[in-house]
Amino acid sequence: MKFIDEALIRVEAGDGGNGCVSFRREKYIPKGGPDGGDGGDGGDVYLVADENLNTLIDYRFEKRFAAGRGENGRSAGCTGHRGNDITLRVPVGTRAIDNDTKEVLGDLTKHGAKMLVAKGGYHGLGNTRFKSSVNRAPRQKTNGTPGEKRDLQLELMLLADVGMLGLPNAGKSTFIRAVSAAKPKVADYPFTTLVPSLGVVRVDENHSFVVADIPGLIEGAAEGAGLGVRFLKHLERCRVLIHLVDIAPIDESDPAENISIIESELFQYSEALADKPRWLVFNKIDTMSDEEAHERAQAITERLGWDDDYYLISAVTGKNVQPLCRDIMDFIEANPRHEVEQTADEAEVKFKWDDYHQAQLADHQFEDEDEDWDDWSEEDEEGVETIYKP
């Protein structure tokens, strides 16, 4: 299945149903009075996270999603049916952004998380709501309000504990194949990895973490060179970044300069991402002796002014890979993910007399009615209700 991590869709909530103007007409019940019902509220549009999805391909071709309109009110005080809600399933890790205002509406980071993205319109009021001591036969009603309509930008950001960084052919995919059951493509040419991939690293029976591999970065990626930096967003939720470096590049490039290139691209993309904990891991030490590998790594770190620890591994042979994984696991357990609790403020429950409808009622000024307040006539048929429409 094709990996799609961005989609632009239009969501339209349902309009509210209109109120009804109706009077009760029944023999032997003089002056039956108003009985027009309220309309129904418009349907809402929700996003819900589904762990069984891993791409936004469902929204590549189908772009418009509309909830149901609320039914109009009816006679006999019948309220219109509420419009049907619609729920759009998206992968866990999806972020919703208003495409016009660029406002981030929220992130869906847990399976089953649900988010309202378009609110349905309010229902209109029937003429029963306008009955008073001085207006016993009201012919007023209100119409329902339009539902929200918005262009929504969906962005999928993978949820992983560890993110892999490095130039093309640094050995990132080989490392993931060595430590997990994931089998990303490995070849001897740049940009073998074209889309992000995830692997689960199981340190022992009770401990595991998720590692994300993204396409390699090159100099100028922030300006769009290579595959650009569009996949760097998948590392924003990682707790630690593993910067994998080819200690002896086949093109004889300088490893210290290669490290500086990645650091520069990170800062140009996001300072927050650049400030994440980053571990330096030198790969492909199987191509030289242990003594030469240590000498090269020490010379590179001294040139960079790197004061933290670093690792020497061979992803092909598996040398020193398990100790690295255990250290990563210890770091993850010592630094649990701090999730912002998105607790929605409990809105005050208001049934029909909410602020909108109070304002609608206040807009109508009534005059004293005459004695023939309900327009009753002996010619009216038995059991017939009169409904007035504008």
From Swiss-Prot:
Cofactor(s) needed for function: Mg(2+)
InterPro entries, sorted: G_OBG (IPR031167), GTP-bd (IPR006073), GTP-bd_Obg/CgtA (IPR014100), GTP1-OBG_CS (IPR006074), GTP1_OBG_dom (IPR006169), GTP1_OBG_dom_sf (IPR036726), OBG_GTPase (IPR045086), P-loop_NTPase (IPR027417)
Annotated spans, Disordered: 363-390
CDD domains the UniProt entry points to: Obg (cd01898)
Keyword GTP-binding among UniProt keywords: yes
Acidic residues bias: start-end ranges: 366-384
Keyword Nucleotide-binding listed: yes
Binding site for GTP: 166-173, 191-195, 213-216, 283-286, 314-316
EC category name: hydrolase
A Gene Ontology molecular function term of the record: GTP binding
Limits of the Obg domain: 1-159
Highest taxon of source: Bacteria
Oligomer status and interactors: Monomer.
Described function: An essential GTPase which binds GTP, GDP and possibly (p)ppGpp with moderate affinity, with high nucleotide exchange rates and a fairly low GTP hydrolysis rate. Plays a role in control of the cell cycle, stress response, ribosome biogenesis and in those bacteria that undergo differentiation, in morphogenesis control.
PANTHER family noted in UniProt: DEVELOPMENTALLY REGULATED GTP-BINDING PROTEIN-RELATED, MITOCHONDRIAL RIBOSOME-ASSOCIATED GTPASE 2
Name listed for the protein in its UniProt record: GTPase Obg
UniProt source species: Pasteurella multocida (strain Pm70)
Gene that this polypeptide is encoded by: obg
